[in-house]
Amino acid sequence: RPSKVKLAPEEVVITDRDEELINKVLKWLEDNVADAEITVDQLAAYVGMGRTSMYNKIKGLTGKSPVELIQAFRLEKATFYLKSGQFSVSETSYKVGFSDPGYFSRSFKKHFGMSPADYIKENKA
């Protein structure tokens, strides 16, 4: 199931083309989430836009840069694996494209306000 991306600011009117772009970005992220080497250039090529145009469009629609969006998607996806109880924090970090479990844990804590281990404790299935 795709992760939710919070769109901001609320005043932004989203056209069908914008929604199509966001859905395409989310599909690409879903398909490539485990790849630690994905780049913004690859995403731009996939959606058929130049890097700068895509940056401006994604930033305008989501309030996040493409890099921030990729990271947020990975961290949201990690919650799915952590909640399942089937994967350790390290295994989860690799499944969502982090090559360094320590960096994953720090990023997770910064994003959610708690460590992955605490998240697991609070969300036992």
Q: Where do the model's predicted regions map?
A:
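Residues within helix-turn-helix
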Residues: 41, 52, 88-91, 101-102, ...
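…primarily DNA-binding HTH/wHTH and HhH modules…
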Residues: 106-125
